[in-house]
């Protein structure tokens, strides 16, 4: 990869050193995750991913474990580093098979293809990956499961199904995007000497956030403050019988730091919401009320509309009013998007910032494109 090349040629860390660090991290991570390495089969290709695999076989052997290698690559295609690691393994007397071994293993380690794979897997390599998947053993992938496109997560003919993927320097995008994510199992990034700063200014690098990052992303609470200091959110959610959608979306607003949350919902939902979320302000409608809605829009710092809103005439009138009169940021989700798909020109009436949050089916309705085209 480019990150490897930068580290080798610009920083000066030799490729074999990176390979050694990778192998050490793979073995250590397997131990931390309680993967049984008592009897391991490492399936190696001809490239540097295969070199990592040969190094893993050596380290496991040095730890007193039984490690065999299935060499699935071609001698003529061996990279310099992979050839070196293979020679070391052979010098140590570790078994290197070229045919499927008739033995049982506690773990199968996939080191056939790395991030550079961009072609469909067929023939011998397909047979190897399919055979690995059939084995009754825990399965670990080196950097990315063989057969997954590192950039898109697409399956290139067939792919290794891992329980654990040990990713060098960072989790590859193909392990986060489906269907690749479902093949990667648990993806764990490990440091091997590639400077994280290398990724900081690259446009092809993506960042993911999890629950642990939430506190870092939200502004700190000031000691001299009150609930009015942290914004007023108007949730226009919940048609009759859809109190749950109104409740869950309001909870989300509180979770990300909203000070005041007002739910504008069908009157049938009032009692349930007052019991479920007594801290929220509940405003209700039985029929469309232009003046009431305009007053609420003036009150809000942020408007969220759509969750459980329904597809009826009242809901449609509410959405039209919001897009015409809202002056603060507006998030449109769920039924709000479905209503919008009937009349996308409504967006042209809105002068406020609008955020749309469609899933694939909603995006298909909005654009008129099939889900396959969008994907």
Regions found by a protein language model. Give the residues of each.
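Internal gly/pro-rich beta-alpha loop/helix module
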Residues: 105-107, 112-204
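N-terminal small/polar loop signature for handling phosphorylated ligands or for N-terminal nucleophile
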Residues: 55-134, 271-283, 291-299
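Small-residue (G/A/S/T)-rich helix-start motifs and N-terminal tracts that mark the onset
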Residues: 1-68, 79, 175-330, 334, ...
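Short, acidic/small-residue loops that bind anionic groups at enzyme active sites
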Residues: 66-73, 124-145, 324-341
């Amino acid at each position: 990869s480019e990150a490897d090349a930068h580290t080798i040629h610009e920083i000066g860390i030799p490729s074999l050193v990176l390979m050694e660090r990778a192998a050490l991290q793979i073995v250590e991570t397997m131990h931390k995750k309680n993967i049984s390495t008592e009897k391991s089969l490492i399936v190696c290709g001809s490239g540097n991913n295969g070199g990592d695999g040969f190094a893993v076989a050596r380290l496991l052997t040095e730890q007193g474990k039984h490690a065999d290698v299935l060499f699935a690559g071609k001698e003529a295609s061996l990279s310099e580093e992979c050839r070196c690691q293979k020679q070391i393994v052979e010098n140590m007397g570790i078994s290197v098979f070229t045919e499927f071994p008739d033995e049982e293993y506690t773990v199968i380690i996939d080191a056939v293809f790395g991030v550079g794979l961009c072609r469909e897997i067929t023939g011998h390599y397909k047979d190897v990956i399919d055979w690995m998947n059939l084995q009754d053993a825990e399965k670990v992938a080196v950097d990315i499961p063989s057969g997954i496109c590192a950039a898109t997560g697409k399956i290139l003919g067939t792919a290794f199904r891992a329980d654990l993927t040990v990713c060098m320097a960072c989790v590859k995008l193909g392990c986060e995007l489906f269907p690749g994510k479902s093949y990667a199992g648990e993806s764990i990034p490990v440091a091997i000497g590639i400077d994280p700063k290398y990724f900081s200014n690259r446009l092809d690098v993506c960042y993911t956030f999890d629950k642990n990052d939430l506190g870092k992303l939200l502004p700190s609470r000031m000691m001299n403050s009150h609930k009015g200091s942290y914004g007023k959110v108007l949730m226009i959610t919940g048609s009759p019988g859809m109190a749950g959608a109104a409740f869950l979306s309001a909870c989300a607003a509180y979770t990300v730091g909203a000070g005041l949350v007002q739910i504008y919902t069908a009157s049938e939902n009032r009692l349930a919401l007052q019991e479920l979320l007594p801290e929220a302000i509940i405003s209700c409608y039985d029929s469309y009320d232009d003046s009431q809605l305009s007053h609420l829009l003036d009150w809000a710092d942020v408007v969220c509309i759509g969750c459980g809103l329904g597809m009826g005439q009242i809901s449609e009138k509410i959405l039209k009013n919001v897009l015409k009169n809202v002056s603060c940021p507006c998030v449109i989700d769920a039924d709000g998007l479905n209503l919008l798909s009937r009349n996308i020109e409504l967006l042209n009436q809105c002068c406020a910032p609008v955020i749309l949050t469609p899933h694939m089916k909603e995006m298909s309705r909005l654009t008129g494109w099939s889900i396959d085209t969008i994907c």
